């Protein structure tokens, strides 16, 4: 593992990064190197926090599934049972499960929302409640890049009275001693790594000759991607006010974690401390998405989807197709392997927007764990 981790730096693929892994309840890997800033003046530390973007969805999904196991939520129930206003515009039958496996059709609002709108949680939820789905719910797959966190977060708030970030902190992170955050106090943000080569939305949509917010997914091949980014500022993933973006809660996209913290979280799943094995066997059943996704196209072909998590159906991240976790745009990834009792996480600050759960930097290390264990 140390050799594979070092090679990423030698080959010029990293600026700062960390990787951690637990096996059978024992911390066996905890490596970090490089710098947390592009200028090379801020050494990466064991508690350096990195933005994991959609890796946040693995944290949020686990919070939601804890409520399901307690009987407070039902995955087969309509979202509108918990959030009545959501039933508008043909959404009365959309279930929580549809949202968690990206099949609800609510990938974004029907109008563009700039950064000033996004910081108003109630306004975002009002727009989503009024929005018509972009396809008939349940009939197709399309990645809920930002709406995943808002829809589940609003349901969570209405049922518990707390936000996902508050619950994560008090019920999971603090008991585990894990550095995992959704919404980070400004007093803690000095520990955050700068994002380098961060993905710009304009670059991702640069080949689209169709200005303006789409009115239909048929307008151009990347219409779904444009809609799913409908909450993001015009220039980059994140915001023009990074301190505010880190401080607010976006339960689908702005988690701040250390590699050790995220691996500790997934180790707790491996140890069945957060969810029962019976429930985890349910949520890692494939819900489709291996071939076509109306937002990501064929980019999901490496994994497939469970209920809130990425799977490993093509065995890219090791030989076990039944692991589950979540990657984030840029390269971070974390997962749990129940059969081999592994909790793994890799984070970095040099973003590669071309990979999600299959970034070569992480893939080589996740496979190395299995090689060391002799698992084929």
What is each model feature region?
Residues 1-52, 74:
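Short, conserved catalytic-motif segment at the N-terminal edge
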Residues 31, 114-136, 162-179, 228, ...:
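Short, charged, amphipathic alpha-helices and their helix-cap/turn boundaries
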Residues 45-47, 131-138, 148-150, 241-251:
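Flexible glycine/proline-enriched surface loops and loop-helix/loop-strand junctions
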Residues 46, 51-55, 67-111, 129-130, ...:
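Active-site helix/loop module of the DD-peptidase/beta-lactamase fold
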Residues 102, 148-155, 249, 253-275, ...:
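Active-site-proximal alpha-helical segments within enzyme catalytic domains
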Residues 198-259, 285-339, 376:
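Active-site Gly/Thr loop motif
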């Amino acid at each position: 593992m140390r050799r594979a981790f070092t090679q990423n730096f030698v080959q010029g693929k990293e600026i700062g990064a960390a990787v951690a892994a637990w096996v059978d309840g024992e911390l066996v890997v905890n490596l970090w190197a490089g710098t947390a800033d592009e200028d090379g003046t801020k050494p990466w530390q064991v508690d350096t926090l990195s933005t994991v973007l959609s890796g946040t969805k693995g944290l949020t999904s686990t919070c939601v599934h804890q409520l399901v196991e307690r009987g407070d939520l039902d995955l087969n129930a309509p979202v509108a049972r918990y959030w009545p206003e959501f039933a508008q515009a043909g959404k009365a039958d959309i279930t929580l499960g549809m949202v968690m496996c990206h099949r609800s059709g609510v990938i974004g609002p029907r109008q563009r929302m700039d950064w000033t709108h996004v910081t108003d949680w109630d306004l975002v939820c009002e727009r989503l409640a009024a929005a018509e789905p972009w396809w008939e719910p349940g009939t197709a797959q399309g990645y809920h890049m930002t709406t995943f966190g808002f829809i589940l977060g609003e349901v969570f708030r209405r049922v518990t009275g707390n936000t996902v970030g508050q619950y994560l902190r008090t019920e999971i992170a603090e008991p585990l001693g894990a550095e995992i955050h959704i919404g980070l106090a400004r007093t803690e943000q000095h520990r955050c790594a700068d994002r380098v080569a961060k993905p710009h939305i304009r670059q991702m949509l640069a080949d689209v000759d169709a200005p303006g917010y789409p009115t239909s997914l048929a307008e151009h091949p990347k219409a779904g991607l444009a809609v799913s980014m409908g909450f993001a500022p015009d220039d980059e993933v994140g915001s023009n006010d990074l301190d505010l973006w880190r401080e607010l809660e976006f339960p689908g996209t702005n988690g701040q974690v250390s590699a050790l913290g995220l691996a500790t979280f997934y180790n707790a799943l491996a140890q069945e401390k957060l969810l029962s094995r019976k429930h985890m066997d349910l949520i890692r059943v494939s819900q489709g998405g291996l071939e076509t996704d109306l937002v990501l196209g064929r980019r999901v072909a490496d994994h497939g989807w469970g209920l809130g998590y990425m799977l490993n159906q093509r065995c890219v991240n090791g030989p076990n197709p039944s692991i589950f976790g979540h990657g984030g745009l840029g390269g971070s990834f974390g997962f749990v392997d129940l059969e081999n009792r592994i909790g793994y996480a890799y984070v970095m600050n040099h973003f590669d927007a071309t990979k999600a759960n299959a970034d070569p930097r992480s893939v080589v290390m996740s496979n190395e764990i299995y090689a060391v264990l002799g698992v084929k």
